[in-house]
């Protein structure tokens, strides 16, 4: 019996071509293969992975394999899998359990397949997560696995919040590296990635003309900043909602109106949630929206939009096409919901471009190497002394440096006198840890 489950294994050849194309746009991962391949720093690591099964993730998986790891994989979202990529990885011999359009039950089953079936004792000893679902499964439902896990690397804001919440409650029994807040992840993937992939998803889903429209962006963190910039670049009038006065002031200084959802719910053509919170667009808002208002989310989970209320209270629900649903309200107006309230850029398009994901995934590989290489020396302790850590600044700068040549960038070199003047090494790190980029 094949140790994988994908939509259609015959898509593997198509997926392989897409992976080869992505490799050319992912210089960080390819350089790690060249640098670390001979030394096999992940030999013996058995990584349970739960991250969007895209073409770009396929390049990550094959990089982990090239560095010696044993890997089993599932997607962290029911709609984000690219079936050609999953097929290609399965055909290459990696146990992958992912397909686009999983049910919630199938999603849970897929994740469960990644915590068994490894060589040796069959169990994983490392976790690579995006959103926290795999981490929660292991800690909450498989206590027998906890003593075997040496560490976690977490990809996204939502998953990092989960780690810190667990830590505050004394329920994080192993150390984790917060990949999300590496500068070369959050200030690139979250901002520049969303700046390109949000509109890609919206246009593939609806063919909407953005110019001249009023768009409400809920949240002005790095993701919200990228989304607002993209919509404005297409000619939209952008209104931002925020709870944090610092982010609200940033939005104001960029020229955005900062208001409440209630202030614009009757006028906005497009609503985008970016907060990672819940109950952002609610039953209080839907009845007041204009006809055919588009509502979508680019936060990790489907908690930001009250989709359940729409399904229970709409007079009619029509699926226009996969991931595009039109609800008829009691007042006769319609709401267009994209990706069923889940990640619109992955549900309705193919996610972030390969180049920016190379930044993020290079961080992931370095985090796995860091945790695995230091598993026995006490640097990342277990139990009561476990914590959430960051990659060192030198590695953050290394990730950026690996991508400069691809975009034709050249670095200026400090002289010894200049380095002494600003009190940093000639070759970096160039900024203190508290520096905010």
From Swiss-Prot:
Q: State where the protein is found.
A: Cytoplasm
Q: Which GO terms describe its cellular component?
A: cytosol
**Record's CDD domains?**
SAHH
Q: Which reaction does it catalyse?
A: S-adenosyl-L-homocysteine + H2O = L-homocysteine + adenosine
What positions does the entry give for substrate binding?
54, 130, 155, 185, 189
Quote the InterPro entries the UniProt record gives.
Answer: Adenosylhomocyst_ase-like_sf (IPR042172), Adenosylhomocysteinase-like (IPR000043), Ado_hCys_hydrolase_NAD-bd (IPR015878), NAD(P)-bd_dom_sf (IPR036291), S-Ado-L-homoCys_hydrolase_CS (IPR020082)
Q: Which example biological process does GO assign this protein?
A: one-carbon metabolic process
Q: Which SMART domains match?
A: AdoHcyase, AdoHcyase_NAD
Instruction: Supply the EC number(s).
Output: 3.13.2.1
- Top EC class per UniProt? hydrolase
From the UniProt record, give the pathway where this protein acts.
Amino-acid biosynthesis; L-homocysteine biosynthesis; L-homocysteine from S-adenosyl-L-homocysteine: step 1/1
Which note does the record give on the cofactor?
Answer: Binds 1 NAD(+) per subunit.
Which UniProt keyword terms apply here? Cytoplasm, Hydrolase, NAD, One-carbon metabolism
Q: Which cofactor does it need?
A: NAD(+)
A GO MF annotation of the entry reads: adenosylhomocysteinase activity
Which superkingdom, per the lineage?
Answer: Eukaryota
Question: Predominant location of this chain?
Answer: cytoplasm
* Role this protein plays: Adenosylhomocysteine is a competitive inhibitor of S-adenosyl-L-methionine-dependent methyl transferase reactions; therefore adenosylhomocysteinase may play a key role in the control of methylations via regulation of the intracellular concentration of adenosylhomocysteine.
Instruction: Share what the entry says about its subunit structure, partners included.
Output: Homotetramer.
The family note in this entry says: Belongs to the adenosylhomocysteinase family.
> NCBIfam families, per this entry?
ahcY, PRK05476.2-3
Kindly provide the name given to this protein in its UniProt entry.
Adenosylhomocysteinase
The species this protein was found in = Leishmania donovani
